[in-house]
């Protein structure tokens, strides 16, 4: 029975040490520009769609915004010091498009924006920390949204190419790992179907999400083409994209549940990776969506296949059990089309895993191993970086700072997920690195500052001071190789 299978999957793996990972394995922390930078209108930066969206009353749970965020724009040297003190060898951050091109068009290059990221990159390298740079983490220049409709317009592909080119030209001599897009699914679904993320569109939920994803895939391939033709030989870097996936486990042995679970993954990973690897969307998506799913020309297919990726980034937090259902009202058109139910409760009443603060996040450590194995098998054993993994605590104002700093559940989460990552390596998956989300507590999109994902606590009431949590100290010990393993030599 699948029920027994699920319970077997929950077996606690052996304790994991730094020595369970290759010596060349990269450990880092991750952030994104809008969530941490602040300085929203400083240094000649143009407004982004998230600047505009958060300034609309009622869009963010606690009425907050990222105008200041955690003020990384002014405190980046302090934050880089923290990364170094904790022992991480890499830092994944994103560049704000409108800090480089204020209007998004490339008609004006903002030298102050270039200088900021140059200084950040140089500060990292001085500390021996490698920069992993995301070009697009959701903060589209608002002028592109207002002037051409943003990602719904095919012209966005060329504008993204111009922006990527400028970043490669200015930073690529020192940046050796580029990520074109972060979680393009979220831009498509939460931005253009459900409407809870900027630009907040839900007027055409059957059309726009798939148009937006279509253009994102082509934009990725365009950036890869530019990098490979103009920069790769001289700069020697690599380029990929980061996709998000909750693992989908069939809720029973029924064939229809197994097919539904496969379909659920097609609507996550396959949506963006299949066109780049196979030349088209998954058949299950075409079957469910019909003509609402755009078609690639033969020339575009060839272009995508030639400009896919050097590595894949996986953002993974949680998993679900999947049952096939037909004609059941779902939370959005996107889920309605998939004809399935995402389940968190086992037949015996137990949850699939312990829930974190966010209602979508349950700790299901075996799911990351299954996701990694799936990606490796389907896409011919690509190098994979886990570019985000972590969990959040609630901040409703009731807990003391002392309690917030002693984040035992986060430590347990990282221990169990890292154990499954090391097992995936033993399975033969080519995993190159792991980035914890996140370095700092920060602006958690529609949830504002009510959710805390950081290894480092940010005191929003007292000058945004930084205080490492227990999880930060755990990682520091782990990276030194002596977590629960005193005195053992690497």
From Swiss-Prot:
Tissue: Expressed at low levels predominantly in root epidermal cells.
Entry's pH dependence statement: Optimum pH is 6.8.
Glycosylation sites (chain numbering): 420
Free-text disruption phenotype from the record: Reduced secretion of root-derived phenolics upon iron ions (Fe) depletion, thus leading to their accumulation in the root interior. Impaired P.fluorescens WCS417r-mediated broad-spectrum induced systemic resistance (ISR) against several pathogens.
Catalytic activity: Hydrolysis of terminal, non-reducing beta-D-glucosyl residues with release of beta-D-glucose
Catalytic site: 183 (proton donor), 388 (nucleophile)
GO MF, one example: beta-glucosidase activity
Family matches, as NCBIfam families: BGL
Protein family per UniProt: Belongs to the glycosyl hydrolase 1 family.
Record's protein name: Beta-glucosidase 42
Origin species: Arabidopsis thaliana
Gene: BGLU42
């Amino acid at each position: 029975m699948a029920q027994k299978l699920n319970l077997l999957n929950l077996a606690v793996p052996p304790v994991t040490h730094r020595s369970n990972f290759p010596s060349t394995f990269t450990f880092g922390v991750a952030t994104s520009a809008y969530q941490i930078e602040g300085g929203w209108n400083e240094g000649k930066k143009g407004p982004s769609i998230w600047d505009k969206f958060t300034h609309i009353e009622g869009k963010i749970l606690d009425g907050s915004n990222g105008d200041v965020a955690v003020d990384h724009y002014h405190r980046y040297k302090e934050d880089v010091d923290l990364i170094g003190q904790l022992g991480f060898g890499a830092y994944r951050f994103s560049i704000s498009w409108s800090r480089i091109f204020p209007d998004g068009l490339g008609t004006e290059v903002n030298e102050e924006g270039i200088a900021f990221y140059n200084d950040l990159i140089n500060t990292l390298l001085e500390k021996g920390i490698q920069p992993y740079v995301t070009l697009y983490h959701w903060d589209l220049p608002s002028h592109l949204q207002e002037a051409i409709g943003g990602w719904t317009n095919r012209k966005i592909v060329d504008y993204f190419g111009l922006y990527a080119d400028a970043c490669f030209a200015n930073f690529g001599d020192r940046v050796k790992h580029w990520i074109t897009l972060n979680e393009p699914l979220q831009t498509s679904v939460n931005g253009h179907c459900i409407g809870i993320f900027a630009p907040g569109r839900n007027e055409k939920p059957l059309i726009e999400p798939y148009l937006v994803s279509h253009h994102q895939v082509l934009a990725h391939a365009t950036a890869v083409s530019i990098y490979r033709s103009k920069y790769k030989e001289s700069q020697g870097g690599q380029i990929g994209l980061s996709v998000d996936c909750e693992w989908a486990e069939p809720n029973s042995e029924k064939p229809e549940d197994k097919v539904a679970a496969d379909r659920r993954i097609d609507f996550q990973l396959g949506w963006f990776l299949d066109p780049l690897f196979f030349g088209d969307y998954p058949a299950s998506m075409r079957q469910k969506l019909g003509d609402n799913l755009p078609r690639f020309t033969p020339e575009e297919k060839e272009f995508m296949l030639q400009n896919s990726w050097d590595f894949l980034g996986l953002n993974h937090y949680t998993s679900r059990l999947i049952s096939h259902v037909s004609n059941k009202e779902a939370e959005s058109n996107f889920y309605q089309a998939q004809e399935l139910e995402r389940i968190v409760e086992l037949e015996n009443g137990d949850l699939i895993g312990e829930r974190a603060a966010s209602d979508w996040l349950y700790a299901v450590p075996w799911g990351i191993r299954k996701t990694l194995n799936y990606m490796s098998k389907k896409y011919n054993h690509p190098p994979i970086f886990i570019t985000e993994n972590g969990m959040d605590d609630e901040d409703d104002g009731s807990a003391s700072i002392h309690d917030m700093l002693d984040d035992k559940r986060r430590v347990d989460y990282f221990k169990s997920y890292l154990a499954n990552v090391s097992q995936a390596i033993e399975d033969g998956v080519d995993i190159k690195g792991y980035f914890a989300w996140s370095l700092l507590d920060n602006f958690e999109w529609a949830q504002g500052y009510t959710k805390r994902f950081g290894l480092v606590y940010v005191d929003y009431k007292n000058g945004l001071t930084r205080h490492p949590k227990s999880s930060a100290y755990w990682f520091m010990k782990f990276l030194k190789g002596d977590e629960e393993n005193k005195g053992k030599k690497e």
